[in-house]
Amino acid sequence: MRIAILESIVMPAGHEVEFDRILVEELKKQGHEPVFFVPERFPFKLDYHCDVDYLDGGEAVSYAGVSRLKRLWLSLQRERRRIAWLNSACQKGADGKCDAVIVPTNSWRVMRSIRHSILKDSKVPFLFMFHGIMPKDRQRFCDGVKSLKEYPNV
């Protein structure tokens, strides 16, 4: 199977980079063909030796080194772009560019974005992975999961 990894978090290094590397290696070991779906001009920190397909919707948004006011503006921009990236990934799946999509880094905000995207009616399965949920976000997370139960490919 051709499995897309949708990555939109600009990461200097650390657990996201390592997690993606492990995911790619495991998919290859199981005989799958991983491909990355990423925002345009995405700054990879590691060469995963996979095909890359760029998503419509704008570049990835980073909060690194910005003021509180600018962060608020960027969070609105990131939300709008996240919906566009999800829509683009969904369309790529419908066009046969992958058999399934894994989204390895998520939050309750992503679940909110799903409800505002065409992804709820996706023809290909989307697997959203969550790790490191903050205790203060627990209820939002649980509510977000419940809100997506009616969508069979999410």
Label each PLM-derived region with a short phrase:
Residues 1-4:
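Extreme N-terminal starter segment of soluble prokaryotic enzymes
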Residues 6-8, 37, 103-104, 129:
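Short hydrophobic segments within beta-strands
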Residues 7-21:
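A short, glycine/small-residue-rich beta-strand->loop->alpha-helix junction that serves as a flexible
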Residues 11, 26-77, 108:
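N-terminal strand-loop element at the rim of the active site
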Residues 12, 107-110, 124-142:
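A short, histidine- and acid-enriched strand-loop-helix "catalytic/donor-clamping" loop
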Residues 64-87, 112, 143-150:
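Alpha-helical membrane-targeting segments
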Residues 74-79, 88-110, 125-129:
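Short N-terminal targeting/anchoring amphipathic segment
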Residues 87-91, 133-154:
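Membrane-proximal helix-turn-helix segments that form the acceptor-binding/catalytic region
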